[in-house]
Amino acid sequence: SGKANYVFIASMDVDPEKEAVFNEVYDKEHIPLIQKVPGVVSARRNVLAPLKMFIGGEVKTIVAEGEPKYSAIYELENPDVLTSEAWAKAVDAGRWPSEVRPYTRNRRHTLRKLTND
């Protein structure tokens, strides 16, 4: 694959009783399918973690109010990847549309252009 010029971030919460199937489908189906889409450089999942950091000379606890628990970060060659036929097929394949997507909420989708190498 080519050089990542954009980052697409999909974030969401999931109903607690569907968390196990959410994680299984995301790891074993959804991410592997999207990684095969032309123009996708990488795809990685993450989960919100507690944050303490130095700000203004003191350690502060940062509370991310309303921030979704789960995110996936996709490095893309260009934003056209997101409107490609291959992307459309990948995001609607497997168990994701029927067994996972209906149980997600607080969904956020953002696209960011990378500005340095």
Protein language model features and the residues they cover:
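Macromolecular interaction modules
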Residues: S1-D117
